[in-house]
């Protein structure tokens, strides 16, 4: 059974995504040195990610006790990327920590170039 976070991302539904996160969720991005903290900041960043990624699709998922890994493919500025959303869950199944890994380096650089201007104001307030 898929985690509601996956369902929300696939539907591009920010309200549903917000409902899957704890108030104090921490998001570790592959293109930011400091994590984003708090549900409002994380939802704003993820909304921007959804605008930058095209052809986004989850291709696999792995689940364990209190954790979920969602493997994905997408395109960023014409570059194919592969990545993984690693979710750490609380006792209610809500996301307490989200770590995103991305490859190859050319895709990470493209992502950083696209996301930097969009989220700089968020990063200053959450690190």
Which residues make up each language-model segment?
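C-terminal and inter-domain tail/linker signature
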Residues: 1-127
């Amino acid at each position: 059974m898929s985690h509601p976070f996956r369902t929300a991302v696939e539907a591009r539904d920010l309200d549903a995504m917000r409902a899957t996160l704890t108030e104090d969720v921490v998001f570790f991005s592959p293109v930011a040195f400091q994590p984003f903290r708090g549900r409002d900041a994380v939802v704003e960043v993820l909304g921007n990610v959804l605008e930058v990624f095209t052809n986004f699709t989850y291709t696999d998922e792995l689940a364990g006790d209190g954790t979920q890994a969602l493997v994905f493919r997408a395109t960023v500025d014409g570059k194919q990327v592969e990545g993984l959303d690693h979710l750490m869950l609380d006792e209610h199944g809500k996301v307490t920590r989200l770590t995103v890994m991305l490859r190859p380096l050319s895709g990470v650089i493209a992502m950083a170039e696209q996301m930097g201007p969009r989220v700089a104001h968020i990063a200053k307030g959450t690190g």
